């Protein structure tokens, strides 16, 4: 840009100088021709007359006009010089500005190069992160495929016939262990509490032994039952009720208590272990209660199960967050 402006300034200055110079030359030529025409024989006739005096006056006036013209030329030249100096100063300022702008452009270019390098580095980092994420996804899918069998088994245990089989096994285990524990406790207490009475009749008949032992067994059964109830009320469990909207377990116990809990499928193994480790209660009259495993059908039952599960979930969150199973 500044080169174009300098060319324009030079062209304008040259045009002004040429026009003024041509005018000066033309004016000088005109003055010379006038003088030559007025004094054609001045060199030949040195004598002066009155007419010659008048011509000299005219020549003096013309010389004055020439001096005025020359002064005008000088003033125009001075103006041209001042204009040229102003143009040169403007050109120098323009050149300084262009240099400053070039420096700024160089700084911007360096910054752009740095930003491009940073962008390349970030792009490489992003690609590496994507590769790591893909590798992690593959590992997660592999682990999920490995654990899918166990998870599906835990979720499907409570559906249909498998749920019935598990409940029947629970009933059998609890009933068999209660009977064994009651018999062992009764035998141990009979042997420890009444050794003399049993040994006092070594040669009696079977009929007499049944008559003497039966009231003792009944009394011991009652006392053991009361002690077991007291110890059971003091015992605490480590199993909690967890809301689960997909699966539910219906538990029927030996002594007639019917409880329905919404347990998570992952806690089923822990729940079974807890059941096996609980203290047993000797019943007054052992009875095997068999109940059928029934599934709720119909829209009303579905609504009731959903409402109960939602209430249980809200109660667990805002009430106590964990509710212990204290009665079985």
Swiss-Prot record:
Residues 93-148 form a coiled coil. The modification Phosphothreonine is found at residue 182. Disulfide bonds: none annotated. The keyword Phosphoprotein applies. The keyword Phosphoprotein applies. InterPro entries: Ccdc54. Keywords: Coiled coil, Phosphoprotein. PANTHER family: COILED-COIL DOMAIN-CONTAINING PROTEIN 54. This is Coiled-coil domain-containing protein 54.
